[in-house]
Amino acid sequence: MVQKNTFEAMKIGLASPDKIRQWSWGEVKKPETINYRTLKPEKEGLFCEKIFGPTKDYECNCGKYKRIRYKGIVCEKCGVEVTKSKVRRERMGHIELATPVSHIWYFKGIPSRMGLLLDMSPRALEKVLYFASFVVIDPGKTDLYEKQLLTEQEYEEYCDKYEEDVDFRAKMGAEAIKELLQKIDLQEEYKNLTETFEGSTGQKKVRILRRLEVVEAFIESKNDPSWMIMDVIPVIPPDIRPMVQLEGGRFATSDLNDLYRRVINRNNRLKRLLDIGSPEIIVRNEKRMLQEAVDALIDNGRRGKPVTGPGNRPLKSLSDMLKGKSGRFRQNLLGKRVDYSGRSVIVIGPNLKFYQCGLPKKMALELFKPFVIRELVKREISHNVKNAKKLVERENDKVWDVLEDIIVDHPVLLNRAPTLHRLGIQAFEPILVEGKAIKLHPLVCTAYNADFDGDQMAVHLPLSPEAQAEARLLMLSTNNILAPKDGKPITTPSQDMVLGSFYMTTRKEGQKGEGLIFKDIDEMMLAYAMHYVTLQTIVKVRRNSVNNDGTSKIVESTVGRFIFNEGIPQDLGMVNRNEDPYSLEVDLQVDKKMLSKIIDLTFRRYGNIRTAELLDYIKSMGYKYSTIGALTISMGDITIPDSKKGIIEQAEQRIDMVQDIYLQGDITNEERYKKVIEIWEQCIKDVTRALMTNLPADNNLNIMAVSGARGSENQIRQLGGMRGLMSDTAGNTIEIPITSNFREGLSVQEFFISTHGSRKGLSDTALRTADSGYLTRRLVDVSQDVIITEDDCGTDEYIVAKEIKDGNRQVEDLKSRIIGRYAFEDILDLDTGEIIVHKNDMINEAIAERIESKGIKEVKVRSVLGCKMKHGVCAKCYGRNLATGKPVNIGEAVGIIAAQSIGEPGTQLTMRTFHSGGIAGVGITSGLPRVEELFEARKPKGLAYITEIEGTVKIQENKKRNDVIVTSEDGEEQVYQIPYGAHIRVNEGDHVEKGEPLTEGSINPQDILRVNGAEGVRDYIIREVQKVYRLQGVDIDDKHIEIIIRQMMSKIKVEESGDSGFLSGSVVDARDFKMTNEQLIKEGKTPATGTHSLMGITKASLATESFLSAASFQETTRVLTETSIKGKVDHLIGLKENVIIGKLIPAGTGIAKYDRIEVDYDGKAEDDMIEAEKAQASNDSEEAEESTIISGNYESLQDEDK
């Protein structure tokens, strides 16, 4: 076996026949598998022990040699080597074919590699390979040309005609193609193609470029083209295609065995036919069948009908073993099932600390079993492991005491599926609980998106000290207070906790005991406990100064607010403490937003440990006082406004008027429909306003909605106002609204109308989940190798950050676009000229506020889009790590975080395509499909026309269309012919910028790239993606979207190659292109020219440098075909390829620079310590064993230092 951490790269190539024989331990000659009587493998069959090794450890087939002492002996009787049976997983065999056959990947792929190399069409190739036509190999003196196809009849005619011409040769089948491939002189071919390439144009040029790429690939990789035709095929080890006995004596076997048997049977039959000199036609048929059998083995179903097994099920071929969700890559290599794990239902744990979880005793015992056994032996409760095991199995009382001690400081990981972002797995300290359910802290539910209606969670146990350290320092819930997507607290209290906080900070006049004055908080608490005052009573209490200067003052507030402030830091900056050191920090009614702000301020000021304490305080206060408040809702809380009837009648009158105007022919049906919908929408608003003003402030329903605990104005409207407009099955708004509410009850017709929406809602949600998951998978794949690799790349590129607007609506302000980024240059105060922030310094909240207050509209900042790093990005271009609020560390896997941050809210985005006014027209895509459309750089539905020059607009109306003419300042004119259906959004005489849309709709990103260049398209994608997310109230930081765009724009299309050696027309890596050009300019040569290319995320994932990553993503066979011809080397730079081969990922603590850390130590002190340990160890044999290990480690360290 190959040691997995010792190799730097992995290469893939074509296997030559010699190579295949070299791998093999013997030839498989018979199709037999195992003997039906003895159940032992047949000799020379597919499971032969002589070839593949013994089926039982250290035991030969005939039984002459048993036991390990004969290791390495080959039995002279049966020929089996005495060794471990594990070798049956790694030893390969081979089959010598009687005739060459082609490899279907290289013949059938698109484009056909064999076809490109030979300059033959795939159809012609197929005819030759499957014995339908002859191909001329050497025309000799005939009037034929090389590679010409002949039918059997023609071939016979030519043979008769040129009997004496000895040179004339034509053949059929793979041997003919093999001969043609052997005749190719690659260098000569390359020279000829390069010459013809320069002079050709159009389709011909594209074809030549493709052929050039294949020829170049073969030259570079030193692969021989004739290896695409196989004389010998490998047989994979038997334990990878096992045969197992089921109860009832039948056998289950891997499909591969069937496919191999077909090949061997046909091969043996062909050998026999050749030996006895059968007629050509029979031999030919057998050769074709052999070719088809090998095709089915390699890729069943690629050509013709797939070979089927029992029940017409297509057999799984070698290619099927690799591709798709259940293939080798995605099923076994990228994610595996692990031991030391368990799962159970979750219940709420309101008494847990923020960093704790409740672990059922039985589960904990099973998970920590090895640790418990070790401890039992160590404490001499049990004398050996066997006894200790029995104690654990019997659940002896002593076991629980040991378990209690062991779980201290040993964090466990909790995971809830689906894990949409990194907060789906967090570490907690376990607390043993009775019962079988895991207890979860209520505040981490938001991050997990968990509720307690029967959700299950999985527990994993980190074993090694390193894993435990990472779990504690990086994954503990206290380190995950902020969400990585926007840097805001994700542990915000919800529901009961919000309600409790809101209730206890409510202020009411005229409550029991109002105006009482207390000497301190304790006296007030005593009064409250004895019911002299209520929570909402306004009282006065003497408070000490926050600045601890010994002064105090009487402060007025409510009892509840005094209690609430006890656990809250009193210097968060909500009160100016220089002027007022006595007031309460939070002297207002606390709703959900306010709680979030308090947590955010505490985190920025005190860090996570103090914040975790605060969270636990808010949690316990919230639960306690929402229980005391006992707020519930009843039918009586829903009051229907008296004015509702009048408002609806008024709307109906206006609609009758619109209907009359329509019937007179003054407006179109579409305009009538729009107007009706508008009238109803206004009516709904009026009813809602009447309802909400009618609701008293202390109405329980109102309290729940206003505080943010549960429900919204929208839901109250449906309960007490009117349900409003509904949509039909196609998603169009029905023009008759539901005027009743749930309090009054719906009529049959209203109920029927409302069912459309409900059913659509459910089916949309199901579809959305799948689409969102697939989008996340593609995003992860495209960005997985973006890791912070250096501190500063010293780039000279920047982006100009300004607020994002959509028409007049602000999508994102300047402040939120620059917080956490590094300034590209000194930013100056426009009035005084003093420097607000220096170049390469981070802009924090305070600086951003200052920049905005000074009226600065745009700022030059560093961005990942301008980072110079070839692999990954640098910390200065990335800026702040949103999850910690500090500068990002080297080794952070920011690509994956970006993908998760964009993908995780995907499920919240709507699926709806909004139709303009409900009449079926060209819909403008929104929601999730719009995000997908942008990231895949597709041509959008409802395409807008854009202007390619800056200038003034003139509109001319024609019979069939409108002409929009844009005239630039220097007199250049461009005419855009716009069909009547399109809605023009510019007016006569408007000034338009380059790339501005002239009509409604979405713009094709490729057009923006052409007109406004790379910067224009970057801004457009960021603006559009943010528009979709902000509409749903989801905040995502720009830098996540920028990372994806960086990957989409990582390639350049070469126009003129100059002295670079690039092929013009080919697509190359942007950073390679830049480096090559810089080098050429240094040497005084001609640099290459090219344009940025914008790829969709799927295409960008497949265009990655790493073939392992691409193959495990999609189109596995295509990727492997291409890369094996190129002889590609995967340098294992990204995360995915390292996961696949089982190395530590090059991110976090696995990054290469941490490998070389050396420990400085004072040799003498260490040696003394070891001596002391050794002395003590002589008393205790177990400790002795441990200390020798320690000293062994030190010695090896010293060797390294030397």
Swiss-Prot record:
Report residues binding Zn(2+) 1.
60, 62, 75, 78
Family of the protein in this entry: Belongs to the RNA polymerase beta' chain family.
Q: Where does Mg(2+) bind?
A: 451, 453, 455
Q: Where is this region: Disordered?
A: 301-320, 1168-1202
- The kind of enzyme this is, by top-level EC class, is transferase
Protein name per the record: DNA-directed RNA polymerase subunit beta'
Q: Which organism is it from?
A: Finegoldia magna (strain ATCC 29328 / DSM 20472 / WAL 2508)
What does the record say about how the cofactor binds? Binds 1 Mg(2+) ion per subunit. Binds 2 Zn(2+) ions per subunit.
Which segments does the entry list as coiled coil? none
